[in-house]
Amino acid sequence: MDTAQAAQVALWVIALLVALALAFDFMNGFHDAANSIATVVSTGVLRPTQAVVFAAFFNFVAIFIFHLSVAATVGKGIVQPGVVDTHVVFGALLGAITWNLVTWYYGIPSSSSHALIGGIVGAVMAKAGTGALLSAGIGKTVLFIFVSPLLGFTLGSLMMVLVANVMRKASPSKVDRWFRRLQLVSAGAYSLGHGGNDAQKTIGIIWMLLIATGYSAAGDTTPPTWVIICCYMAIAAGTMFGGWRIVKTMGQKITKLRPVGGFCAETGGALTLFLATALGIPVSTTHTITGAIVGVGSTQRASAVRWGVAGNIVWAWILTIPASAFVAAIAYWVSFQLY
């Protein structure tokens, strides 16, 4: 194979990896659509079809609102410069996609975000060991595995207590009528946070690939515009198709929600995502909204939360990073042997 042919093959490999990354982004929207719309559907504020269009719109609008701090963390802040190559990116994406498909099939609301982080970690470790990982980026990501659901829980429960006190003299029918309208605001805010944090993770891994292959300079402060637009379009399109198995778990099986509870859960989750995105931390939208839903349910009574379902979700969270890392390491090794 001469130089021109080798360059052409390399370009095709890069194009296929970009397509695979956008497929992951689409799947992220599909898999995590439930996070944005489960409460607004389960409370009857919007029909499922209306809800996915609503969420997809705000997923894309996030492109105009948030700085690309999360993309910078994923693209430049997790792995040592010079370690990433096409095999690493392939392994990372395959590990994340495989885990997403498994959890989607079983209707488990796991984290697409942490599946991607696990995939990156697994592929990088397979190539160069733990020394190739940047402790600062990995550290804050791991820390927020625990912080984001706890913060969502705290904000969701505080919002519920505050609203209950403010509205204590209002009739239940009046409260429901008011919060059916207000939940459109909270659902829109949460969908903004979902798009702003999650689309940037795919932007980050494509940017990582382009830097590694010389199509973007390591000193660039932002990724190419086409990458940003494509990633936000992909996650919005994925959200349009939805993930109804997970909607049922998130919106009904953990705890029954009224519009006021949906508003408090979405607002608590949205505030958590806005904070994390501003800090450049790739967090799990799934962890965040689940924590907020449990927080809202726990203010009613402990038995209002189906702790068995919540426990199964926690186990899926615990397994996400090691499982996706394991698949990514195998995928890296196989691709390295074949190409």
Regions found by a protein language model. Give the residues of each.
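Multi-pass alpha-helical transmembrane bundle typical of ion/small-solute transporters
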Residues: 1-339
